[in-house]
Amino acid sequence: MLILALDTSGKMASCALLQDGVVLDLLQQDSQMDHSRLMLPLCEQLLQKHGLTFADVDVYAAVVGPGSFTGVRIGTAAVKGFSWAQDKPCAGVSSLQAMACGSTENGVLCCSLKARPVESFYALFQREDGFLIRLTEDKVGKDEEMEAAAERHGATVFLRDCQNAAGAAKAAWMQARSGKLQNCHEILPAYLRLSQAERLRKERMEQQ
């Protein structure tokens, strides 16, 4: 099974190819959040490097959040388009799970992304002998809440802002093996919190 995975949830745009559980290659570029312009050429470059086309891909995967709202929308829309055009299944992957899958360390992993100055997106996982188990759902909260959760679960490995498409491809492979792939209509962004515009609108409505 050949998986093409995209990650546009942060400043780095990346794409990766995975064949039967093994990452073949990873391309990434600091796009300064210009993912809409760079993502398609980056995918084409990766496929051409290995003598492949979009038609050769069996599963398309995207990091669907949490992370940059705009970036998440771009990656999700791209994979929806690839999946629809090629009539292939797809996988929506958590950025935090991608981070965990990209690590090889055993123990309890606390994976986090900066959300706001004093808030983080976070989730905890446990890996033993190559098996990854999710301990918590993806959450957003104050850094103190994340630290308390990490202490409660006995976290020994701390990963922050280091997700990429290679980890996303591994997470998609896990979904494929467990029969949890999606179609192009089912994959959706997972923001976890309101955008700034939505937050301001909500505050204005509450003040009226």
PLM feature spans:
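Short, well-ordered amphipathic alpha-helical segments that serve as non-catalytic structural scaffolds
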Residues: 35-50, 96
